[in-house]
Swiss-Prot record:
This is Patr class I histocompatibility antigen, CH28 alpha chain. Residues 206-294 form the Ig-like C1-type domain. It comes from Pan troglodytes. GO terms for molecular function: peptide antigen binding; signaling receptor binding. It is found in: Membrane. GO terms for cellular component: external side of plasma membrane; extracellular space; MHC class I protein complex. Residues 22-111 are annotated as: Alpha-1. The chain crosses the membrane at residues 306-329.
Amino acid sequence: MAPRSLLLLFSGALALTETWAGSHSLRYFSTAVSRPGRGEPRYIAVEYVDDTQFLRFDSDAAIPRMEPREPWVEQEGPQYWERTTGYAKANAQTDRVALRNLLRRYNQSEAGSHTLQGMNGCDMGPDGRLLRGYHQHAYDGKDYISLNEDLRSWTAADTVAQITQRFYEAEEYAEEFRTYLEGECLELLRRYLENGKETLQRADPPKAHIAHHPISDHEATLRCWALGFYPAEITLTWQRDGEEQTQDTELVETRPAGDGNFQKWAAVVVPSGEEQRYTCHVQHEGLPQPLTLRWEQSPQPTIPIVGIVAGLVVLGAVVTGAVVAAVMWRKKSSDRNRGSYSQAAV
């Protein structure tokens, strides 16, 4: 099914901003999970502007509907919620049919649980133009089919996915979706950036410090923390006597802090007594200039465990839903993920 127009949801035209601070993205993630013996597959969809989730749909909710996750989107009128909910329900049904088709095509048992994930959306440059568009599916955690960067052709992961590819090509789906990406997706993104500019266009700098953890009489771990920053894009590096220690650095993925901001750390194991030779370097758009930190032997502030635990709790909650499943998969398919539309069948 081809992309549908959402511009009719909005009364009045958005006054376009000629330039934007940096690039921005609109992403729609969906996950459909079959559960034999327990009814229809569960469908969860979440929508993001940059690193901020602002919409969520769960077919298992008491009243399944698209729900706001940010105050700035609550201002939308009843027609907006009726239509976005309608799209989510239509996409849920499409993915349920797709799950049954894939089960048959892969000759799999109906007794097992299977997952179909989707991600689509657009990246917009500072000039307001399309940087890149996305339309991807994964089945049981593996890439299935994706729209190529040229927005004209598809990459199928196997012979089963080639069936979907031939269907998309016969329906000229790439052309229709490209029209959506270059037009409506960017229009929606601009609108959301304007309505939520106080939240979405902020740049909260990280609070950074170094923690020292002795391992033995001969070694210690230096862990460089960056806390409370937004957006999620950040660079943490360790240097020894001015030389980057890329191979020896343990670096965790950026994770939510539980309050709309993010946290991250990078660690190195160093010989005891040589700590002063190591410096941590932090780069983030919220900083007027990069930070350089060196561990000092004086008492350090206690690591804010509550904030860290909150972040882990949030991350764990997301794992049980759809978001982290999509994020784990998108690591392979996107650097950093749509406006609502009715999905094509798989």
